[in-house]
Regions:
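Conserved phosphate- and dinucleotide-binding cores of soluble alpha/beta proteins
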Residues: 1-119
Length: 119
């Protein structure tokens, strides 16, 4: 999986994420930051092409995996990486919950890691 520019995982956006859901799949509304990322990543041509809702695995479903691997490229995600690793575990940055998983690995490029690297 990946981490979104707004700290989402799957389509669990900050305004919609819940750590205690019972369902494993749900329909969710996508915020404009998440929708714009779909354009930035080349998935859609324009913002108006991106659906406003999507189906997503919930956070409990993602966290139930034995191993979690996240690939997080580009400097556009540097702030989200910082919030994930250094901020509080909170639905304000859904990816922060990955810190509570017993076997989660993040693969970052230099640009995505730029706000957590100390030189």
């Amino acid at each position: 999986m990946g981490i979104g520019e707004n700290g989402h995982i799957a389509f669990n956006d900050p305004h919609e994420a819940r750590f205690d859901e019972e369902a494993w799949i749900r329909q969710t509304s996508l915020d404009n930051v998440c929708r714009q990322q779909q354009v930035n990543d080349g998935e859609f041509g324009t913002l108006s092409d991106v659906p406003e809702t999507a189906l997503t695995l919930t956070i409990p479903a993602l966290m139930s995996c034995k191993k979690v691997i996240c690939i997080v490229p580009t400097g556009r995600k540097a702030q989200a990486v910082r919030q994930t690793l250094c901020g509080p575990v909170s639905v304000a940055c859904p990816a922060s919950v990955l810190r509570t998983h017993s076997d989660a690995t993040l693969f970052l490029d230099k640009e995505a890691a730029e706000l957590i690297l100390t030189i």
